[in-house]
Amino acid sequence: WGATVITNLMSAIPWIGQDIVEFIWGGFSVNNATLNRFFALHFLLPFVLAALVIMHLIAMHDTVGSGNPLGISGNYDRLPFAPYFVFKDLVTVFIFFIVLSVFVFFMPNALGDSENYVMANPMQTPPAIVPEWYLLPFYAILRSI
């Protein structure tokens, strides 16, 4: 139901909206494959956000810097984005990924939830994402679009 409401917003796009909805669903209806695709996209979203953060750091702190948006030459009044701090942060990130890799590759179920092994049911909203009663009018409005 939630996948239907969210993706039906795409159907408001003229001419190609319905095609986009069917592409996202993987067919003409929401079924187990669609829900598994949504779960996979929700897994990938943090990595996409991390990539955007890295792109921001590269774009804003490379040559011009966020303290000099006009690109005016005058490095004497601009603080550098200290390489020491970048290196320190990279060491921290690498240590985090090493620890995370140990869990992922050697103990995959240590931090898991037994709910992860339950097959998705397209006819039942999972209890963790059941909408609150005060949001139901807004969901009704979205469904009517």
From Swiss-Prot:
The keyword Heme applies. The gene is cob. Keywords: Electron transport, Heme, Iron, Membrane, Metal-binding, Mitochondrion, Mitochondrion inner membrane, Respiratory chain, Transmembrane, Transmembrane helix, Transport, Ubiquinone. It is a multi-pass membrane protein. GO terms for biological process: mitochondrial electron transport, ubiquinol to cytochrome c. It comes from Aspergillus fumigatus. Heme b b562 binds at H42. This is Cytochrome b. It holds the Pfam family Cytochrom_B_C. Disulfide bonds: none annotated. Heme 1 (or BL or b562) is low-potential and absorbs at about 562 nm, and heme 2 (or BH or b566) is high-potential and absorbs at about 566 nm. SUPFAM superfamilies: a domain/subunit of cytochrome bc1 complex (Ubiquinol-cytochrome c reductase), Transmembrane di-heme cytochromes. Heme b b566 binds at H56.
